[in-house]
């Protein structure tokens, strides 16, 4: 006799599920997922047609600046800044703990499979004890929770964004390319320090000692993309806005240069990744929010509407201040700028104006 699977009755308040179950069942499939020390089985029902709509699409346009770990948007009513999967660290910590524990147990129970240097011998087979299998199941469960959290968080942000507008202006992002390591090996001009026994530090540059030659790191944004899945957010946003009857515009990055332009001087200057603020006239702006503002002031795919920028810039500054005061979820970008605003003003020499 096969396994009996029961379906829970539909709740009266769950309108979405009631509408979905009115459609014709196309086919079913059984899905297995790890939960703590065992697997659980779920029946997934695929219905005919499109899914019911949960939200109401907003009206108006929106400038969206996407990053590998954050998004910033600006529209008629609001300027906001969000971190993708802000609480991902607790899931990463759990995965790390179980990974280390599983590797230790496997090494302890299979010492013959490792050489003198601690490397695995090719062709060796591992025997897992009951405790090792339990640890492995907990590790799989941790990965499942992380995946579910990323998907749930990104879907929530997509829905909140669609409630604000029906036209999104953004930059096309190739997250697959950003995740790859750099191919070229480049030397760095940074100074390395060597510590002596008397704890006195001696500065050594690459010109004074060949041993102290420093090289730039080849890693880029792979770790951040793995943790926060900005590619999933982008693809989900594009598919959902089309399904709800809205649209999106991908600007020409080479000509538009939303992250580089200053609408007052009308000049483009490429900033460093560490520079999170920009000086526009006499005002300091958060770089990502300002990029979203320039995307909002859209003329065509290659040009910014500078006249619209001048008209709306004061309104942008007010919205930025309100965002920094009210939304304490701004990670360390805008909050840090707010706390150190007076210092930044002095550094930029604004007291001279």
Predicted regions and their residues:
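Positively charged, helix-rich recognition surfaces that bind polyanionic ligands
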Residues: 39-353
């Amino acid at each position: 006799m096969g396994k009996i699977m029961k379906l829970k009755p539909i709740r009266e308040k769950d309108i979405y599920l009631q509408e979905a179950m009115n459609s014709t069942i196309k086919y079913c499939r059984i899905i297995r997922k790890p939960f703590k020390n065992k697997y659980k089985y779920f029946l997934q029902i695929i219905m005919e047609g499109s899914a019911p709509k949960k939200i109401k699409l907003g009206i108006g346009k929106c400038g969206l600046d996407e990053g590998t770990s954050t998004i910033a948007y600006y529209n008629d009513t609001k300027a906001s800044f969000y971190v993708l999967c802000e609480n991902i660290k607790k899931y990463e910590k759990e995965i790390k703990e179980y990974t280390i524990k599983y590797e230790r147990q496997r090494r302890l129970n299979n010492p013959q499979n490792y050489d003198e240097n601690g490397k695995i011998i090719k062709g060796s087979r591992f025997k897992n004890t009951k405790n090792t299998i339990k640890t492995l199941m907990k590790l799989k469960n941790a990965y499942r929770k992380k995946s579910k959290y990323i998907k749930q968080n990104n879907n929530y942000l997509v829905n909140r964004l669609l409630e604000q507008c029906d036209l999104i202006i953004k930059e096309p992002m190739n997250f697959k390319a950003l995740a790859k390591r750099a191919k070229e090996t480049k030397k760095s001009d940074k100074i390395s320090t060597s510590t002596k026994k008397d704890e006195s530090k001696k500065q050594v540059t690459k010109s004074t000692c060949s041993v102290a030659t420093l090289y730039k790191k080849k890693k880029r944004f792979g770790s951040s993309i793995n943790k926060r899945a900005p590619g999933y957010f982008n693809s989900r946003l594009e598919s959902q806005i089309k399904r709800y009857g809205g649209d999106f515009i991908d600007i020409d990055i080479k000509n538009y240069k939303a992250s580089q332009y200053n609408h007052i001087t009308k000049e483009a200057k490429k900033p460093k990744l560490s520079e999170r603020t920009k000086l526009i006239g006499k005002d300091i702006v958060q770089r990502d929010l300002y990029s979203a503002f320039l995307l909002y002031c859209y003329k065509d795919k290659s040009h910014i509407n500078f006249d619209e920028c001048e008209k709306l810039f004061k309104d942008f500054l007010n919205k930025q201040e309100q965002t920094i005061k009210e939304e304490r979820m701004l990670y360390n970008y805008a909050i840090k700028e707010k706390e150190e605003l007076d210092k930044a003003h002095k550094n930029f020499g604004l007291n001279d104006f």
